[in-house]
């Protein structure tokens, strides 16, 4: 399959360095009345929601004694109809024959186990990232619970879920060192593709998931140990909080190029997130009096 045409266009009409339409909103309709902060984020057809509970006092008294800062726990999930495989499974469930039905049941169980294992891995990643990004020293002997779910998965679901979590933290008033943004990129047909969709993810190319800060790093802040640095262009420098390479092996130059592409895309997506934050703050300020 040709992922990039001769004209330099992808299957959905985008250029290699273009991301899909993104939309950021606060207060998702599912948990806005029961949580301290909630948000939803959409990247193309990929849609994710997130909720934040806390910070609150730790439930375990024995754990309070040894806990110096905020403990962050994450829970990630995905709906049964989020992926295209689930839709195909529903369509095949109407076929006749006990053999086909047993095969469909086995396939459904296997897919469920894979999704559950993948969600647990994503939750562990988010816990490590948020522990670094949040100022945990302000909340000693406390805990914070983050819940996120992917409603529709059309590629780059992990980046969409993380951006929803960042917005939910802002809605809950949890202090972070900066506004963070995540983006995915892959390499297919010798081209570096930003914000890969579901079709490009199934191309089994090298994929990079990157979380970076949105502000430029100042010279006097270089001693602040939070992550690595990447020059986006000649005038800006971003701090990389976390990145992960999956899907195979490639050269260091390729990985560096994919990370730079992710940081450049995160810079554009963060502008949409900041617009949503400003609207949220103005709304809260108007309802205060």
Feature locations, PLM:
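Polyanion-binding surfaces on beta-sheet-dominated domains and ring/shell assemblies
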Residues: 1-289
């Amino acid at each position: 399959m040709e992922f990039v045409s001769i004209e330099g266009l992808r299957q959905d009409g985008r250029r290699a360095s273009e991301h899909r339409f993104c939309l950021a909103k606060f207060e998702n309709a599912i948990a806005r009345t029961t949580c301290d902060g909630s948000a939803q984020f959409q990247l193309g057809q990929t849609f994710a929601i997130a909720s934040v509970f806390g910070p609150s006092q730790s439930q375990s008294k024995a754990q309070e004694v040894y806990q110096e800062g905020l403990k962050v726990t994450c829970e990630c999930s995905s709906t049964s109809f989020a992926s295209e495989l689930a839709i195909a499974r529903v369509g095949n469930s109407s076929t006749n024959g006990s053999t086909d039905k047993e095969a469909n049941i086995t396939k459904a169980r296997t897919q469920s186990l894979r999704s559950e294992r993948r969600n647990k891995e994503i939750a562990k990643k988010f816990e490590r990232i948020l522990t670094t990004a949040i100022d945990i020293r302000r909340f000693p002997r406390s805990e914070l619970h983050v819940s996120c779910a992917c409603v529709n998965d059309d590629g780059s679901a992990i980046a969409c879920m993380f951006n929803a979590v960042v917005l939910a933290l802002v809605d809950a008033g949890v202090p972070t060192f900066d506004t963070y943004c995540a983006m995915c990129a892959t390499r297919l047909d010798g081209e570096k593709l930003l914000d890969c969709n579901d079709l490009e993810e199934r191309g089994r190319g090298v994929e990079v998931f990157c979380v970076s800060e949105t502000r430029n790093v100042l010279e006097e802040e270089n001693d602040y140990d939070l992550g690595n640095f990447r020059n986006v262009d000649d005038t800006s420098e971003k701090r990389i909080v976390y990145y992960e390479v999956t899907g195979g092996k490639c050269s260091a130059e390729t990985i560096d190029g994919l990370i730079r592409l992710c940081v450049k895309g995160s810079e554009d997506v963060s502008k949409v997130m900041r617009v949503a934050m400003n609207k949220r703050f103005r709304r809260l300020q108007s309802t205060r009096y």
